[in-house]
């Protein structure tokens, strides 16, 4: 059995670490390279970086951050945000990332998933899914709809159907983010995570809502996730990565406990 993973998520704007709630109200909370190094030393299994700026100038700043991170940490890390082509994927992988995460671009152009997998291998392609709970309907039978642009645009696409499509196209992993739970610290949307995990054979990362280690344990047990993505609870010093992993291990989750 594979160990469950704890993955801190770092949103980067203009080269600085930032954090908001439900994709708004972002504030500067530090240096992403220093934070990545600290999380690596605390025992993070992987790290995810999202570039939440869109300009070409900011992209150059972000790639510099990626290169500096690659010099400081020795665990896998993935990069997302603004990746809309195989050339974009190549740029972040050459900068030192092990994986790329694509979200809105994959919804708009599903072929990008397969193109990326063909070029770099499925293991390098993570598809991020931003999901909104909606009333069940013939169009959205699961009651979970894919949204893009930070949750601002609904796509009329059922999340379960999209997860299966991503697997068929060659994705190596899915990161499932609940828009409703994001930043609330009230716990993950376990029903959503479980539904996706049951629908595909890919590893599923639970995202959105972690407020304490118990929530992370719930995600990888009842939620069926392979990993728990966290942000606020470690960025603001409420818990350390080590505390989270030790709690999960003490309550039955298989964890990598090396520091």
UniProtKB/Swiss-Prot annotation:
Q: Keywords, A to Z?
A: Amino-acid biosynthesis, Cytoplasm, Histidine biosynthesis, Lyase
- Can you say what this protein is called? Imidazole glycerol phosphate synthase subunit HisF
Oligomer status and interactors: Heterodimer of HisH and HisF.
NCBIfam families per the UniProt record, alphabetical = hisF (TIGR00735)
Looking at its record, which EC class is this enzyme? lyase
EC number(s): the record gives: 4.3.2.10
Database matches in HAMAP family: HisF
Upper lineage ranks? Bacteria, Pseudomonadati, Thermodesulfobacteriota, Desulfovibrionia, Desulfovibrionales
Keyword Amino-acid biosynthesis carried by entry: yes
GO annotation, cellular component aspect: cytoplasm
Please name the source species. Desulfovibrio desulfuricans (strain ATCC 27774 / DSM 6949 / MB)
A Gene Ontology biological process term: L-histidine biosynthetic process
The UniProt similarity line reads: Belongs to the HisA/HisF family.
């Amino acid at each position: 059995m594979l160990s469950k993973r704890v993955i801190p998520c770092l949103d980067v704007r203009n080269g600085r670490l930032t954090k908001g709630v439900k994709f708004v109200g972002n504030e500067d909370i530090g240096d992403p390279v220093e934070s990545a190094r600290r999380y690596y030393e605390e025992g993070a299994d992987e790290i995810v970086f999202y570039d939440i700026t869109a300009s070409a100038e900011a992209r150059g700043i972000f790639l510099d951050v990626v290169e500096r991170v690659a010099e400081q940490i020795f665990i896998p890390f993935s990069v997302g945000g603004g990746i809309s082509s195989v050339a974009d994927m190549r740029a972040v992988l050459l900068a030192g990332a092990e994986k790329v995460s694509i979200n809105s671009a994959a919804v708009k152009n599903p072929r990008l998933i397969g193109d990326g997998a063909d070029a770099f291998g499925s293991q390098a392609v993570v598809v991020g899914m931003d999901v909104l709970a909606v009333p069940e309907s013939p169009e959205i039978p699961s009651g979970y709809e894919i949204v893009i642009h930070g949750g601002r645009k609904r796509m009329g696409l059922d999340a379960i159907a999209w997860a299966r499509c991503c697997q068929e196209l060659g994705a190596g992993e899915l990161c499932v983010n609940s828009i409703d739970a994001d930043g609330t610290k009230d716990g993950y949307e376990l029903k959503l995570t479980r539904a996706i995990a049951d629908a595909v054979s890919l590893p599923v990362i639970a995202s959105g809502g972690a407020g304490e280690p118990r929530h992370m344990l719930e995600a990888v047990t009842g939620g069926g996730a392979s990993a728990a993505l966290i942000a606020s609870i470690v960025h603001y010093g409420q818990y350390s990565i080590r505390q989270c992993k030790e709690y999960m291990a003490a309550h039955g989750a298989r964890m990598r406990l090396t520091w």
